[in-house]
Amino acid sequence: MPAEGACDAASLMTLTATLSDVTGLANLLKSVAIQTHAVVIASSSGLEIITELNRTLQAHAYLYSHMFDSYRFENAQDDVRGSTSLQARSRPKKRSKLTSKHAETADSQSSAASSDHESGQSQAHTKKRFRANSHSYAQEADRVHDEPDSVSFEVNLQTWISCLNIFGGVGPSRPHSSSSGLPGFRPEQGSAEAPPGGRGYQRTRYGVADAYGAERGTSVERGFDRNPFSSSAKATRMKLSYQGHGNPLVLELEQDANVLTRVSMSTYEPSFLTDMVFEPQNMVAQVIVASELMQSAFTEIDASCKKLSILITSPHSLSTYDGDQRTEAPAPTNRNTSASMLKFRAISDTGSSEMEFPASLTSSDPTGVIEKFVALPGSSEQWYDFTLLSRTMSVLRSSIKTSLRMDEAGLISFQFMMPKYRRAAAAGAPLTNAAAGQAAHEDEQDAFCEFLCCPLDTSTLIV
């Protein structure tokens, strides 16, 4: 019975969201598609899509409620929790009444001399238990109410992406296959090596390959558009709904007034996810750069590279903390060691290579490639599996900025700022829906996704 009641309450949960253009959503889902299936966590604040690889790499895509044209999440468990908390608070009163009745019966059966003393002790003990139970029930009820309401399920991410592009016009797919999805793939449109017609056979980590694999067409047709919200393609509207545990995820896609497609995707029990959380208070280093810079750095790494070290260093990282006060250490005499920089060191079968990106000391320096640079005491060189970090190449090609953060334990966080999530209405185009057109103009937000990667064990690492 309790299990059935929980399932019934979960089945009453309602999630409904609408979007006037699915381009941003599709590109965001493609960025975290490192696995076939993904875990979706829905709450009143929005959706979170999580994929995990080898218990070492996690990808998170955050779709906040304000990114949708309309978003509604209702949880029927609120009523169930409310009734449970009321019952919990009423239990101590029932216990106190029973205890008082028991004390009165004991008083009538005991002698007059000892009854006053025993009843006084019984009443004091009863009041103490009542206060303790009331306090514990109140804490439990407050803890239940403090927990955010959410529901999690698992879906086939590749199916979801394919459904969003059912009418076309969403934009080219960002494949993760053995051709264009290679970590070393670098589009070179307009280069002298490209053959006439725009068709390119670009240099990859594994030699020369077709830039877009089995997909035939010119680079202009198949290449990624840096402005996915151009007015050349028609927008695909979407309505997403989910009715709770055991129910499918329903997508209603519409491009024209007379064309409507309804897709029902199966949902599964969410898989176990590794507890990987980046705590901001444990951050020891942070760098914000343009995604193109990070992409070019990863592209230049040799194909046989297995291990990559990342070092964020500055003269301030040599300082020590004394409580809230920071004491600067004497500046080193070596100019190279005193420079603030982001350093990559890759080890491959053919040797090792190093790349250094100096940090600009002044915001007015136009030659600086790093927008923000933070290196606190405790920042040290950390090694990572490059085959996992190379999974970020697809999102590097479609993002604008990249924030690289590192904590004391070496856990690294890549946060990618994606292009504008909503589609701007074309100039002079008639708006069939005034509300949707107004929403497209207002409150445009930058979406982002995050990759978390654990470091290698340096105690057993052979460099």
Swiss-Prot record:
Name listed for the protein in its UniProt record: DNA repair exonuclease REC1
Protein's job: Plays a central role in regulating the genetic system of this fungus. Has a 3'-->5' exonuclease activity.
BP terms from Gene Ontology: DNA damage checkpoint signaling; DNA repair
EC assignment: 3.1.11.2
Gene Ontology MF annotations: double-stranded DNA 3'-5' DNA exonuclease activity
Catalytic activity line of the entry: Exonucleolytic cleavage in the 3'- to 5'-direction to yield nucleoside 5'-phosphates
Keyword list, A-Z: DNA damage, DNA repair, Exonuclease, Hydrolase, Nuclease, Nucleus
Major place of residence: nucleus
The keyword DNA repair is assigned to this record: yes
A Gene Ontology cellular-component term: checkpoint clamp complex
Effect of disrupting the coding gene: Cells are very sensitive to UV light.
Bias kind Basic residues: ranges: 90-100
Region (Disordered): 81-128, 172-203
Native source organism of the sequence: Mycosarcoma maydis (Corn smut fungus)
Family: Belongs to the rad1 family.
InterPro entries to which the protein is assigned, alphabetical: Rad1_Rec1_Rad17, Rec1_exonuc_Ustilaginaceae
Localization of this protein: Nucleus
